[in-house]
């Protein structure tokens, strides 16, 4: 739901478009690098997160890390294919589907070399948090805490 309580949804690029800042272009690969991502205005329904889609299938960790190096206030959400992030009214992200969600939290980044390096160079990021959530696990966008939820129960 958005701030007015209206349910919103998007798939693929439509999911990325929901937030205030969206990744309009980005190089694939695991290493963040200066200038490898172009952000564009999104629909602006939230400024709390940046969404990237087809995340693991297209090796997009580096571009999400780069986007957060530019905008460390936001939480990065990488959606695997066949997977959705349901955000409850209490700002808790729930995973639905057969894949996972990668949550990247830049709130505690204590150093980023983004301002000191030339375009195309790798970015140094210290203090970045990364969570891999599957169905049953959650992440609260307000407290920025991940929880294993139902996954803690032993397999029967």
Describe the residue ranges of each PLM region.
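Catalytic nucleophile loop
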Residues: 1-22
């Amino acid at each position: 739901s958005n701030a007015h309580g209206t349910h919103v949804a998007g798939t693929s690029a439509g999911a990325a478009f929901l937030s205030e800042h969206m990744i309009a272009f980005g190089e694939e690969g695991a290493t963040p690098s200066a200038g490898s991502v172009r952000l564009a205005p999104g629909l602006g329904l939230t400024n709390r997160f940046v969404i990237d889609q087809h995340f693991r299938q297209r090796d997009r960790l580096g571009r999400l890390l780069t986007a957060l190096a530019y905008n460390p206030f936001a939480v990065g959400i990488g959606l695997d294919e066949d997977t959705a992030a349901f955000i409850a009214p209490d700002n808790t992200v729930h995973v639905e589907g057969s894949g996972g969600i990668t949550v990247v939290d830049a709130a505690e980044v204590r150093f980023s070399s983004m301002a000191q390096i030339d375009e195309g160079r790798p970015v140094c990021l210290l203090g970045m948090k990364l969570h891999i959530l599957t169905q049953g696990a959650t992440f609260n966008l307000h407290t920025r805490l991940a929880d294993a939820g139902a996954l803690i129960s032993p397999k029967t």
